Design a protein with these regions (language model features):
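Extended, highly charged clamp/arch subdomains and adjacent linkers
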Residues: 1-14
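Extended two-metal-dependent nuclease catalytic cores across DNA- and RNA-processing enzymes
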Residues: 15-269
Length: 270
């Protein structure tokens, strides 16, 4: 659940599939055994199929969690927070000299890459590091945040500046592909581009004016840069105190081999 982000931005992930109540998934993990669903005669086949899909989801997820536990993979689930923030907090407080590989299809996580942290992007089937981010993603990892602050994120329904997508962003600020830029520099360069066109008796580009005037189709209004930064910036994870304690507890907890073997794993997946 991403309640902490919904509180900042009500339209967060509003474009996602509404058929499932994702918050209910987390609540039902521990009492998964309550499988029985009562079907009333007046339910449509669509409703029945949806309930079957939900039941299958819970069953498969429960099996996956048991397999991971058997393989010594520690798991954390907390209300109101998202996996990205748990990962970011762990990376921020990792053990000295610990090397981390994050496996995800979410390229937002490349914000976290460092000399000892890389992201295996599942769609690309590549390990993304500070050295190859430009080659595989197209621009320096240092600008993942600023690009999304300006352009938004379609997958999470985060609106950006009107008329400024990724292509336009890099056309306006080509240096952003290879070196870190700040919001102040984006605003300064936008104003410079506006002034240059006016000197040539040309109408300023709407995209640069929108950047200066903070024009967006989203509900963020004039606070768009501040709100988008809080939603997207993984250097400051949005976590509850309970979630922080949960991560702290597992970081140095010893592995418990008692009762684990491949026979158990085989019986789980049968």
């Amino acid at each position: 659940s991403g309640k902490l982000r919904y509180d900042l931005y009500p339209d967060y992930k509003a474009n996602r599939d509404k058929n499932y109540d994702k918050s209910e998934y987390d609540k039902m993990i521990n009492d998964y055994c309550k499988k029985v669903i009562e079907y009333s005669k007046n339910k449509s086949s669509k409703e029945i199929n949806q309930e079957k899909e939900e039941e299958n989801f819970h069953r498969q997820r429960d099996i996956l969690f048991k397999c991971l536990e058997e393989l010594y993979c520690r798991q954390l689930i907390f209300d109101y927070v998202e996996g990205d923030d748990l990962i970011a907090y762990y990376c921020k407080h990792k053990k000295p000299n610990e090397k981390i590989v994050i496996v995800s299809g979410d390229r937002d996580l490349t914000q976290l890459i460092a000399d000892d942290i890389c992201v295996y992007v599942t769609q690309l089937k590549k390990y993304i590091t500070p050295q190859n981010h430009i080659e595989h993603i197209g621009y320096t990892h240092e600008n993942v945040l600023i690009k999304k602050m300006i352009c938004g994120d379609v997958s999470d329904n985060i609106k950006g500046i009107k008329g400024v997508g990724e292509k336009t962003f890099f056309e306006l600020f080509p240096d952003a592909k290879t070196k870190r830029i700040t919001l102040d520099e984006v605003l300064e360069q936008s104003q410079k581009l506006i002034d240059e066109r006016r000197l040539k008796k040309l109408k300023p580009l709407k995209s640069t004016e929108n950047i200066i005037n903070k024009v967006t189709n989203g509900c963020q209004g004039e606070d768009i840069y501040e709100i988008n930064k809080k939603i997207i910036d993984l250097s400051e994870p949005l976590l509850t105190d309970e979630a922080k304690k949960g991560i702290d507890d597992i970081m140095y907890a010893p592995l418990d081999p008692e009762g684990r073997d491949f026979k158990n794993l085989y019986s789980i997946i049968q």
